[in-house]
A protein has these predicted regions:
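N-terminal leader/auxiliary helical segments
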Residues: 1-76, 83-298
């Protein structure tokens, strides 16, 4: 979920003024940071972390970050990312699903509008990126958690670190764009230009929207969903602190985390993400291109 500003504000609101804001802000990028890798393997891993064995990985992150204050703030930011995604993504997917199916471009536009909405009422600037030594330490802990979660991963630590740096750099630029007046323009499935604006978000919510996974109709909009996300973030941070103090074991922590998909907000095994319309179109173009190429060779 590329709502950088919303993720960061949720994490820093829950963690308070005494946290390491740079580390927590990087943690608030969650698994999205891996999408900024130049390596397809890391991007694919980022996708899997959103919708497979989610509680298990979060426990590994907390374990890997337990003995360093800045890394603990990073891990709690990561928990906040999970809480915000679980709260908001059903709404985002509902708004991104059109007659022909789910559109990843409209998903992005919706999340930019969410950032614009929150930046418009918050007006708090984004946190700065962690310094080099802090990023190196966080990178090592994140890499350790990944290897615990998937031991056969061929992890390039240098590329993982580059992804973290790009995430904070490009994420900051996108966060500022999210606060600009106006809306992000996208094309619908008929090729007609559409807008997704902050005002549309609340109007869509008030008209009632259907959760794509549960079928439940809701009128909750950005304010209600943000309230739910902040409440859940507070619960997860409290559980993490109990775990670090030895007052909660890993199995209990997993139960508190809920093992939910970041995308559906439901149990990950029973709520696979929809395939974007754009992916099907890309495959169709590739088939036509490869067919024409093979005919030319003959």
């Amino acid at each position: 979920m590329p709502s950088f500003y919303m993720h960061e504000r949720a994490a820093l609101t829950s963690l308070g003024e005494l946290c390491d804001k740079s580390a927590a802000a990087l943690g608030a990028c969650g698994p999205d940071a891996l999408y900024f890798s130049g390596a397809g393997e890391l991007r694919a891993l980022g996708k899997r972390l959103h919708c497979e064995r989610t509680s298990e990985f979060l426990v590994y992150i907390l374990r890997a970050c337990a003995d360093d204050a800045a890394c603990r703030d990073y891990a709690m930011g990561f928990l906040s990312h999970y809480a915000v995604d679980v709260a908001f993504h059903p709404f985002v997917y509902a708004l991104s699903t059109m007659p022909l199916g789910y559109s990843s471009l409209r998903h992005i536009a919706t999340e930019r509008a969410l950032d614009a909405w929150l930046m418009g009422i918050s007006r708090v600037p984004r946190a700065s990126a962690p310094d080099e030594s802090e990023i190196s330490e966080i990178n090592a802990r994140l890499g350790a958690a990944i290897m615990l979660w998937q031991p056969d991963t061929k992890l390039d630590a240098a590329e993982l670190k580059r992804a973290l740096k790009r995430c904070m750099g490009l994420g900051g630029a996108l966060g500022r764009l999210g606060g600009e007046p106006g809306a992000l323009r996208v094309d619908d499935e008929a090729g007609m230009e559409q807008l997704v604006s902050p005002d549309q978000l609340q109007a869509f919510a008030l008209s009632g929207w259907r959760n794509p996974w549960t079928g439940i109709v809701s009128c909750d909009g950005p304010f209600e969903l943000l309230g739910a996300a902040l409440k859940r973030t507070d619960e997860l941070i409290a559980a993490a602190r109990l775990y670090w103090r030895g007052m909660m074991d890993a199995s209990t922590l997993c139960a508190v985390l809920g093992d939910r998909s970041y995308l559906s907000g439901e149990y990950w095994r029973t709520s696979p993400p929809p395939e974007p319309l754009e992916a099907g179109r890309l495959r169709a173009v590739k088939r036509v291109f490869m067919g024409a190429k093979s005919k030319a060779k003959k």
